[in-house]
Curated annotation (Swiss-Prot):
Mg(2+) binds at residues 14, 40. Keywords: Lipid biosynthesis, Lipid metabolism, Magnesium, Metal-binding, Phospholipid biosynthesis, Phospholipid metabolism, Transferase. PANTHER family: HEPTAPRENYLGLYCERYL PHOSPHATE SYNTHASE (PTHR40029:SF2), PTHR40029. It comes from Shouchella clausii (strain KSM-K16). Its cofactor is Mg(2+). Belongs to the GGGP/HepGP synthase family. Group I subfamily. Pathway: Membrane lipid metabolism; glycerophospholipid metabolism. Homodimer. Signal peptide: none annotated. This is Heptaprenylglyceryl phosphate synthase.
Length: 232
């Protein structure tokens, strides 16, 4: 298992999307640092378990990004807990978390939990609507959220989520500049090696999700692109 603070490249797999055994093998053996299992729509215990069982055939670190309490299952290396900092509904900031701890607090292995301070910035994405996120933010707003994530909440991760489209590099650069201990994760619109390399210049962790379902061959090239950039 690769420790989370060593991650540079991650693939995100959606339990609600089809992936062939051949494609899954290519993803899991690509050299990526981890696989995150997670999605927005129709994430169930059954499809989460099905995908997890297939991933576990390979020696790759696997984390569950929790979006629905009913889909939580033991066995993952880590459990990523999103807090949507720019949500306009308290449930997505702390409400769902309180409910989870109230129900499962006695059995939670706290060492496996990693909090993510999410900043959802693509207003057209399903996750923005789902989490009631205020997405019309300027760079200073994003920088403020990054500072909150590190200095007030002390989250291990601050996640810039553009979900399906590539965000402005200036936003990534400015957020990166104010973070020291908190790792900057970027996700959204990474389709090829050039995209990944550009983002890797500033983000600690590059997430490739939708791109692997659209063009697997190009998505696989992002692993080497990120690793090469981090070695410079």
């Amino acid at each position: 298992m690769k420790n989370y603070d060593e991650w540079a490249h991650v693939f995100k797999l959606d339990p609600n999307k089809e992936i062939t055994d051949e494609a899954l093998e290519a993803v899991c053996e690509s050299g990526t640092d981890a696989i995150i299992v997670g999605g927005t729509d129709n994430v169930t215990l059954d499809n989460t378990l099905s995908l997890f069982a297939r991933i576990r055939r390979f020696p790759v670190t696997c984390a569950l990004e929790v979006s629905d309490l009913e889909a939580i299952t033991p066995g993952f290396d880590y459990y990523l807990i999103p807090s949507v900092m720019n949500s306009q509904h308290v449930s997505w900031v702390i409400g769902h978390h309180h409910k989870a701890v109230k129900e499962y607090g006695e059995i939670i292995n706290w060492q496996e939990l990693l909090l993510e301070g999410y900043c959802v910035l693509n207003g057209e994405a399903r996750v923005a609507n789902h989490a009631n996120a205020q997405t019309d933010l300027d760079i200073e707003d994003v920088v403020a959220y990054a500072r909150l994530a590190e200095h007030m909440y002390r989250y291990p991760f601050f996640y810039l989520e553009y979900s399906g489209k590539k965000g402005p590099i200036d936003v990534v650069k400015r957020a990166s500049a104010v973070l020291e201990k908190t790792k900057l994760i970027y996700g959204g619109g990474i389709k090829n090696a050039a995209d990944a390399s550009e983002i890797a210049a500033y983000a600690d962790v590059v997430v490739v999700g939708n791109g692997l379902y659209e063009n697997l061959k190009e998505a696989l090239k992002t692993v080497e692109a990120v690793k090469e950039h981090k070695c410079r």
